[in-house]
């Protein structure tokens, strides 16, 4: 099996190094990732300048572009062979609820949505993960991803991917299939004056998780709930954002 690994934390991030090491027993692993951090780029592609992939080690490439650029290049001519699976991560920080709209980790996985197997976006969730600087800090999460793939990935409809969040806890309680939760409104922007006397702004922190009432008949909970309770969250998400439930009513209202 040929496995493509990308991320949004950059090619030298410890999370992607741990993931590559863990997946090598499953086949050929090729890392193609941004040359520096590109968090928050979602599915953005670079269309206004050339991209420059540079091989920095055997089967490791750095690209002066976005996470989605890395996967797009890899699937469309950078290599003379095809990939069977795209795995994006391991991200330093959670990608839960509304965060998937902004996530470069998820965006890279969505570029692999038409592969032979469902693409995977994987993130390590916890308050301390952004300070981790060694691949051993991601070892438990990387092993979980290895085992998840080795067992055989569950089938998904076309153009769907797995968004996986692994809590950073000493002992995982298990795995839960989850739905995408949501956040309250983001915190307000903050204003500062830089050393040159110019007004600058920081985008506010993400809003707190919202506890939705149970939306489906089974006991399936949100991704926030699973991670908060030390379970790995596995959420199937799709590229098609159409709300089919309201199509006919909307059509009637315009008729």
From Swiss-Prot:
GO molecular function, one term: metal ion binding
Keywords: Cytoplasm, Hydrolase, Metal-binding, Nucleotide-binding
Swiss-Prot/TrEMBL cofactor(s): a divalent metal cation
Binding-site list for a divalent metal cation: 8-9, 39, 91
Annotated InterPro entries: SurE, SurE-like_Pase/nucleotidase, SurE-like_sf
Entry function: Nucleotidase that shows phosphatase activity on nucleoside 5'-monophosphates.
Keyword Cytoplasm: yes
EC number(s) reported in the record: 3.1.3.5
NCBIfam families: PRK00346.1-4, surE
Chemical reaction(s) catalysed: a ribonucleoside 5'-phosphate + H2O = a ribonucleoside + phosphate
Name of this chain's protein: 5'-nucleotidase SurE
Any one GO CC term of the record: cytoplasm
Organism superkingdom: Bacteria
Compartments where found: Cytoplasm
Cofactor binding comment, as recorded: Binds 1 divalent metal cation per subunit.
Similarity comment text for this entry: Belongs to the SurE nucleotidase family.
Top-tier EC class: hydrolase
């Amino acid at each position: 099996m040929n496995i493509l690994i990308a991320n949004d934390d950059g090619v030298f991030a410890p999370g992607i190094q741990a993931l590559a090491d863990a997946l090598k027993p499953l086949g050929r692993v090729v890392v193609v990732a941004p040359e520096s951090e590109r968090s928050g780029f979602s599915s953005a592609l670079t269309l206004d300048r050339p991209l420059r992939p540079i091989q920095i080690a055997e089967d490791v490439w750095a690209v002066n572009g976005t996470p989605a650029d890395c996967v797009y290049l890899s699937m469309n001519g950078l290599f003379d062979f095809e990939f069977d699976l795209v795995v994006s991560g391991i991200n330093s920080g959670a990608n839960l609820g509304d965060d998937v709209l902004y996530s470069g980790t998820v965006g890279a996985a969505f570029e692999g949505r038409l592969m032979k197997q469902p693409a995977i976006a994987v993130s390590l969730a916890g308050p301390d993960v952004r300070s981790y600087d060694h691949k051993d800090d991601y070892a438990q999460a990387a092993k979980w991803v290895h085992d998840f793939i080795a067992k055989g990935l569950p089938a998904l409809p076309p153009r769907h991917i797995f968004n996986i969040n692994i809590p950073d806890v000493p002992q995982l309680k298990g795995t839960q299939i989850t739905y995408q939760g949501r956040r309250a409104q983001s915190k307000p922007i903050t204003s500062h004056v830089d050393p040159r006397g110019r007004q600058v702004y920081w985008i506010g922190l993400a809003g707190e998780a919202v506890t939705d009432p149970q939306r489906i008949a089974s006991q399936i909970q949100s991704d926030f709930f699973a991670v908060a309770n030390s379970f790995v969250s596995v959420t199937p998400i799709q590229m098609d954002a159409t709300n089919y439930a309201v199509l006919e009513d909307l059509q009637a209202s315009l008729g």
